Curated annotation (Swiss-Prot):
Species per Swiss-Prot/TrEMBL record: Klebsiella pneumoniae subsp. pneumoniae (strain ATCC 700721 / MGH 78578)
Record-stated family: Belongs to the nucleoside phosphorylase PpnP family.
UniProtKB keywords: Glycosyltransferase, Transferase
Annotated GO CC locations: cytosol
Protein name in UniProt: Pyrimidine/purine nucleoside phosphorylase
E.C. number(s) listed in UniProt: 2.4.2.1, 2.4.2.2
Length: 94
């Protein structure tokens, strides 16, 4: 079953799903802006198109992840994103 989600006044939209190959995941698009997300469990984020400037928990420097690149976020934490252009992503819940 698909589940639609909308965050930050519609600037981030995702569709959640579960599949045998991916497990529980969501795919979505972020408009330009700055966002802070909280995690309940570890997440693996893959940038599909565009780029994300990311500040991960415990880090002091931002890092840019371009299309095809992956980063991991620990559970029970927050991470910060800066988005300069519409960017799509796949988030796997680990």
């Amino acid at each position: 079953m698909l589940q639609s989600n909308e965050y930050f006044d519609g600037k981030v939209k995702s569709i959640g799903f579960t599949s045998s190959s991916t497990g529980r995941a969501s795919v979505g698009v972020m408009a330009e802006g700055e966002y802070t997300f909280g995690t309940a469990q570890p997440e693996e984020m893959t940038v599909v198109s565009g780029a994300l400037n990311v500040l991960l928990p415990g880090e002091t420097e931002w890092k840019v992840y371009a299309a095809g690149e992956v980063f991991n976020v620990p559970g029970n934490s927050e991470f910060h994103l800066q988005v300069a252009e519409p960017t799509s992503y796949l988030c796997r819940y680990l």
